[in-house]
Amino acid sequence: FNKRFGEKSAAEIIGFLNDYMSRMVNCISLAGGTVDKFEGDAIMAAWGVLRDESLDFEKLDHFSPEYKKAYTIHEKHKKEDAINAITAAIAMRYALMEYNKKAMEFTRAHEVEGDVKFKPMIRIGCGINTGRATVGFMGSNDKMEFTSIGDSVNLASRTESSNKPCGTDMLIT
């Protein structure tokens, strides 16, 4: 990221990031995801965090009908959330392909004019992991942020960072 934009103005970098983030967030939202945070050019998202489903069923007798019903619903949602996260990642790949196609056309048009303007081709890496996370507003009286923390979140982050050395754009654990 820094290599491509090192000589660009702050306004150009922010403009690019806003365009890129809008495209990616749209894919996440359409697949039922919730954006947790932006970290530089990275987006952290989660699925199932705003559902009213409670894990209180785990306190029930495991042989009771109430437990079985709640557990079945919970397992169904876990599978749906995983599929939706993968769907978002695939949609992000397609949105990025469309962006890169337009960026190439823009750059070619400006090369003909002898102008040095260009739009960079970009790649993304998606790291997908399923599991429990602690989710909520965290911080201090001065600043609170909605975020997700936990082992499953850390593994997703490490998985994402493995894309570049692996030569991939999506890794799923």
Regions found by a protein language model. Give the residues of each.
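Catalytic-core segments of nucleotide cyclases and related cyclic-nucleotide turnover enzymes
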Residues: K78-A82, I86, V116-F118, G125, ...
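Catalytic NTP-binding/metal-coordinating core of nucleotidyl cyclase/transferase enzymes
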Residues: F1-T87, F146
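A short beta-strand->alpha-helix segment at the C-terminal rim
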Residues: Y94-A133, E160-T173
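Active-site lining segments that contact anionic ligands and/or coordinate catalytic metals
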Residues: G40-D41, M121-R123, N141-K143, G167
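ATP-driven catalytic headpiece of P-type ATPases
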Residues: P65, K78, T87-I90, Y94, ...
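Hydrophobic alpha-helical packing residues
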Residues: L17-Y20, M24, M92, L96, ...
